[in-house]
Amino acid sequence: GENISDADMQQAADIAQATEFIDSKVDRYNSLISQGGTNVSGGQKQRLSIARAIAKHPKIYLFDDSFSALDYKTDLTLRKELSKQTADATVIIVAQRISTILHADNILVLDEGKIVGSGTHEELLASCETYQEIAKSQLSEAELAGVEKGGRA
């Protein structure tokens, strides 16, 4: 494996919101994770994977449904901290939850493998029927109203 300093790994764990559960383990950063991660929860496994990616400081990050097992608060905090760390990198997020990609610079909407929309959240709410349907099924009326007025939901 790569040589990642303890400080870089701890910073990555902080960003990935993994520090609390790592610190709760007897061996902390030296704890063994079973094959397939069966001794950690789905959300913990995702946060460990995200921390490993962050610690490597790549120029391109690809998160493929990496936030799906996280609760809303953890997802929001993690993405906020992640955006600070990845300001000079390209970040590609594959997601099914609109809340995960709400503030992305550009969102591609796929329907049956074809791109049916491209733009910001606000642009897609105004122009893409598929995105509108997804947004209405996932976001509350208050979130839709707040976002449509340029607020942060």
Place the predicted regions along the sequence by residue:
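ABC-type ATPase nucleotide-binding domains, specifically the catalytic core motifs of the NBD
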Residues: 1-6
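C-terminal portion of ABC ATPase nucleotide-binding domains
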Residues: 7, 15, 23-28, 80, ...
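ABC-fold ATPase nucleotide-binding domain signature/coupling loops
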Residues: 19-48, 66, 70-73, 141-153
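ABC ATPase nucleotide-binding domain "signature" region
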Residues: 41-42, 48-53, 77, 93
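A short, proline-enriched helix->beta-strand linker immediately N-terminal to the Walker B motif
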Residues: 55-59, 88
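Catalytic Walker B motif of ABC-type/P-loop ATPase nucleotide-binding domains
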Residues: 61-64
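Conserved D-loop/post-Walker B switch-helix segment of ABC ATPase nucleotide-binding domains
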Residues: 71-81
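Conserved catalytic loops of ABC-family nucleotide-binding domains
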Residues: 84-95
